[in-house]
Design a protein with these regions (language model features):
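Extended ligand-binding clefts on enzyme/binding-domain cores
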Residues: 45-85, 89-92, 114-118, 153-158, ...
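Bacterial Sec-dependent signal peptides at the C-terminal "C-region" and cleavage site
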Residues: 38-45
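Short glycine/serine- and small hydrophobic-enriched flexible loop segments
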Residues: 125-132, 183-196, 269-276, 338-342, ...
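Internal amphipathic alpha-helical repeat/solenoid segments
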Residues: 65, 75-120, 128-173
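N-terminal secretory signal peptides that target proteins for export/translocation
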Residues: 1-22
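Bacterial N-terminal signal peptides
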Residues: 27-38
Length: 445
């Protein structure tokens, strides 16, 4: 998550000009990554690939494991009920928050850190549209637009969403975390297709089109932004959320941290959709961004373990400016395997994604049934907690895996209870989306 003012005039878009330890393997790691990435996307038979987008058929890993559709639906419904409408003290992450002129408001909160994040709001919207829960979707979107959308034309985050706020809507950061915008855009397109467009902020397609255009084209803006953790203001220049030259999503568009990326923000399955649904003049860019991310997955993952760091430079090398912990496989990095596996499931354009899932699952199988949740890239465990969110994403990796071991990861997810307590925000949302993916219910709408 990146560092990270009310509604008003829209921001202008302006197009820009076009088992040895890892330290013994670092040279071969990056050389192998560059070599493999040069192979390009493989085995696609047409522009729509061979996956669920082309066939309309989504794998149901739970059914393949022998569970009935009634059991699967019961598990999905139960998890949603608990996380969205359960006991507010120790179960739910979704909280109604009154209403305004646009209707009901609700937020999803990070229980552990007592805040609201675009990550969670946009994940919640995606879950809601997949499950046909329009009231929850609209309430989360209304809260996002009311409290986090930045409309001031002289603000460096203009046209995007401040990534973090208190539960009362007061912003804790004025910066942008692009993974939120990525999920907002895709969830809005799905809502437009599933429910049709309404008026104002509920004209889902218009909202998605405008946000997507800004994500590539918004002109740089320089302004003063508060940094509460430093008890000062700083002058920041920020522009679009994607690097035009490298065709990669940024960790943050702000000038002090826009020269690197977060592997878990790379969502080629979404970029393929944007190339079809967004502005025609941007279609080729999003197609290239999808292929770039597929290459990047190979470059940034360890050639033996399949693990990736939290952050990486555009060439896949380590980002060291935020401390050693972000060169390891940690919480952000949980999600990356899910991203390449869903890309394979929907598009089947790059067979290397299957190899990545096999490597990753082979590593976690070798780590034992109670593997931890933070590792160096060569596999040294840094934290022993067996995280439900990581269990969830490792099951999603089975969508791309070839090896029969994949069934073990699906069955572990099936036997894992819905997260509750202190860790239920991140773990719970990853778990909920994993149930949808593994149950064949996370679809292109």
């Amino acid at each position: 998550m990146a560092f990270g003012i009310g509604q008003g005039r829209a921001c202008a878009s302006q197009k820009l000009k076009p088992k040895a330890r890892f330290d013994l393997k670092i040279v071969s790691f990056f050389c192998l990554g560059v070599l493999l990435s040069g192979l390009g996307a493989a085995n696609a038979t047409g522009p729509d690939g061979n996956g669920a987008y082309a066939t309309g058929s989504y794998r149901n890993l739970f059914a393949e494991a022998g569970h009935s559709q009634a059991e699967i639906q019961h598990k999905i419904d139960g998890a949603f009920q608990q996380l969205f409408h359960g006991n507010p003290t120790n179960e739910t992450v979704y909280y109604p928050a009154g209403s305004n002129s646009n209707g009901p408001l609700a937020f999803i909160t990070d229980i552990k850190h007592h805040d609201v994040r675009t990550e969670g709001l946009s994940y919640g919207m995606m879950i809601a549209v997949q499950l046909n829960k329009k009231p929850e979707f609209d309430a989360l979107w209304n809260w996002s637009k009311t409290y986090l959308y930045v409309a001031e034309t002289n603000h460096p985050s203009c046209g995007f969403f401040a990534w973090q706020a208190r539960t009362n809507g007061v912003r804790m950061s004025q910066f942008v975390a692009p993974d939120g915008e990525e999920y907002y855009v895709t969830a809005l397109y799905f809502a437009a297709h599933r429910w049709r467009n309404g008026a104002g902020i509920y004209n889902y397609k218009q909202q998605a089109d405008e946000l997507l255009s800004r994500m590539r084209h918004r002109a740089p803006i320089t302004g003063s932004m508060p940094m509460p953790w430093r008890n000062t203001n700083v002058t920041v220049t920020a522009g679009p959320l994607f690097d035009e030259k490298h065709k990669m999503v940024l960790f943050s568009p702000s000038s002090e941290r826009n020269r690197f990326t977060d592997p878990s923000y790379h969502l080629p399955a979404f970029y393929e959709l944007w190339s079809r649904w967004g502005a025609s003049e941007d279609s080729e860019f999003w197609k290239q961004a999808a292929d770039t991310s597929r290459d990047f997955f190979v470059r940034v993952t360890h050639p033996v373990t399949g693990l990736n760091p939290n952050y990486a430079n555009f060439d896949g090398s380590f980002v060291t400016t935020f401390g050693r912990s972000n060169t390891n496989f940690s919480y952000d990095a949980f999600r990356t395997a899910g991203n390449w596996s869903v890309d394979w499931s929907w598009w089947e354009k790059d067979v290397r994604e299957r190899q990545l899932s096999d490597k990753l699952q082979a590593f976690f199988e070798s780590a034992g049934t109670n593997y931890g949740c933070q590792f160096t890239l060569d596999g040294k465990q840094m934290e022993p907690r067996h995280a439900q969110g990581l269990v969830a994403v490792n099951a999603v990796a089975s969508l791309a895996a070839n090896d029969p071991r994949a069934k073990k990861f699906v069955e572990e997810l099936w036997n894992t209870p819905t997260p509750d307590g202190l860790e239920r925000y991140y773990e719970g949302l990853l778990y909920m989306m994993a149930l949808l993916h593994c149950g064949g219910e996370f679809k292109v709408w």
